[in-house]
From Swiss-Prot:
Chain segments annotated as coiled-coil in the UniProt record: none
Function, in words: Phenylpropene O-methyltransferase that catalyzes the conversion of trans-anol to trans-anethole and isoeugenol to isomethyleugenol. Phenylpropenes are the primary constituents of various essential plant oils. They are produced as antimicrobial and antianimal compounds, or as floral attractants of pollinators.
pH dependence: Optimum pH is 7.5-8.0.
UniProt name for this protein: Trans-anol O-methyltransferase 1
């Protein structure tokens, strides 16, 4: 064994215990603690655990102490803030009070803006968690972890059977997409001369709504499987269409694939792209919006997010993965597009355009 390094040991220990943080997060989200903090104290104020407990449906006298311990670990990771205040009751002169930060605001359930609470609920759903039990089996024997954990059903087949998981996925997309898309659309100007945009796999049209907000001249078609489309909200400038992208895609001047190809193998991605090729005019294009993997692992926050998402694809999808720019360009070539180009990247997303003509 290499020489002992205590700092390295403590870092390794923290990694082992890191699941305590997201475990606490999901508990507090389900208890609506972040919502209580927002409602009662806003972004600038603080609440004592006693005050939070008063807003929960509990008579447990230990609830404030338990909440304090849960909130304390989040404060140690700078997810929430903490300060010492005079206690409401009891013998201690000072005790801890907690407040929201720019990070923890994204765990408030009842807000119109971006929220990661549905995503955390999704990945902690028992039907998602059980994929971990099958990863090693998939590595050694082949196949896919989610399929093995669900009697052969793929993730997308399972969505048609479990409304709770399907709804969490749709909420996740609706609540998490706009933040990064709005940042990207400040740099990407590829829709300025386009009259009609088809968003393939658009769920509740979060991406298309962002595109139209930056390009109000655009007419939008939101295309997804029927069980998703039937719950999609009515939105100005957007027509919802149900169908199967492996069979056909609605015709449009530009077709958007936002976070779609990462769900599928290379072979299936090529099939999707071929259907898109058939649906665009000679002057049309396919706009791929995805997280872009680097060729070598990097340790900045965006690269870490992308690598972590790649593991989610390994867990849940039938062969999906995050790809590099060169891998996307190769998929376009295999699908018959004679010309393609990486356009730009901003925040988590990058854009690759595929053209029907050179």
């Amino acid at each position: 064994m290499a020489s002992h390094d205590q700092e390295a040991f403590l870092t390794a220990m923290q990694i082992v215990n890191s699941s305590a943080v997201d475990g606490v997060l999901i508990c507090l989200i389900e208890l609506n603690v972040f919502d209580i903090m927002m409602q009662k104290a806003g972004m600038d104020g603080y609440l004592h655990p006693d005050e939070i407990a008063l807003n929960l449906p509990t008579k447990n006298p230990q609830a404030p102490e338990m909440l304090d311990r849960m909130l304390r670990i989040l404060a140690s990771h700078s997810i929430i803030k903490c300060k010492l205040v005079k206690k409401m009751s009891g013998n201690a002169l000072l005790t801890r009070a907690y407040g929201l930060t720019l990070i923890s605001q994204y765990f408030v359930n009842a807000q119109d803006g971006p929220c990661l609470a549905p995503y955390l609920k999704l990945i902690h759903h028992k039907q998602m968690q059980n994929s971990w039990e099958k990863v090693n089996e998939a590595v050694l024997e082949g196949g896919y972890a989610f399929n093995k954990a669900h009697a052969g059903s793929t993730f997308f087949e399972y969505l048609g059977k479990d409304k709770s998981v399907a709804e969490l996925l749709s909420q996740t997309m609706a609540k998490s997409i706009p933040t990064s898309m709005n940042i990207l659309l400040k740099s990407y100007k590829g829709f300025e001369g386009v009259k009609e945009v088809v968003d393939v796999g658009g769920a509740y049209a979060a991406t298309l709504s962002c595109i139209i907000s930056f390009n109000p001249h655009v007419k939008g078609i939101n295309f997804d499987v029927p069980h998703v489309i039937k719950n999609a909200p009515s939105l100005p400038g957007i027509t919802h269409v149900g169908g199967d992208m492996f069979e056909s895609v609605p015709r449009g001047e530009a077709i958007v694939l936002q976070r779609v190809l990462h769900d599928w193998t290379d072979e299936e991605s090529v099939k999707i792209l071929k259907k898109c090729y058939e649906a665009i005019p000679d002057h049309g294009k396919v706009v791929i919006i995805e997280m872009i993997q680097t060729e070598m692992p990097e340790d900045d926050i965006i690269a870490k997010n992308i690598s972590e998402m790649d593991i989610r694809m390994l867990l849940y999808t039938p062969g999906g993965k995050e790809r590099t720019v060169n891998e996307f360009l190769m998929l376009g070539k295999q699908a018959g597009f004679p010309s393609s180009k990486y356009i730009c990247g901003a925040d988590l997303y990058g854009v690759v355009e595929l053209y029907k003509k050179k």
